[in-house]
């Protein structure tokens, strides 16, 4: 059995860890040369912004809906990915990193109730309280 650890809206979420004022706001992270949206916050998705939307087509939402467009910060995302994968590695005996924000954790031989393990994973990687930011990165 395997667990999948997957960062939600990973690039956008990384930006909010160090800039908490962005949490809950419509936010897109833009590709190299700020050409198109490569990551979207939930609030940006609610505006109907599609993955890969060209910036010139959605820039009008800056004034009308408070959209924030940020240039990609790949060193930040790499650092946050390394932190996340280090935490994930301790959740089971094997780990297969699939992408910058996805990892499969082997659960063979893991003792205890898997539901409790799932709750531990959620606690490590997720909080909805802006004051806590991400408990796992202190």
Where are the predicted features?
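Gly/Gly-Pro- and Ser/Thr-rich, intrinsically disordered tail segments characteristic of DNA damage-repair
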Residues: 1-128
């Amino acid at each position: 059995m395997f667990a999948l650890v997957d960062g939600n809206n990973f690039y956008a979420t990384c930006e909010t860890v160090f800039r908490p004022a962005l949490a809950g706001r419509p936010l897109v992270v833009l590709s190299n040369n700020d050409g198109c949206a490569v990551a979207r916050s939930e609030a940006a998705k609610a505006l109907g912004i599609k993955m890969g939307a060209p910036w010139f087509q959605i820039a009008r939402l800056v004034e009308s809906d408070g959209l924030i467009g940020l240039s990609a910060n790949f060193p930040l995302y790499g650092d946050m990915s390394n932190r996340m994968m280090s935490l994930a590695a301790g959740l089971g005996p094997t780990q297969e990193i699939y992408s910058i924000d996805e990892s499969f954790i082997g659960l063979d031989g893991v003792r205890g109730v898997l539901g409790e393990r799932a709750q531990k994973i959620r606690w490590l990687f997720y909080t909805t309280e802006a004051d806590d930011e991400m408990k796992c990165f202190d």
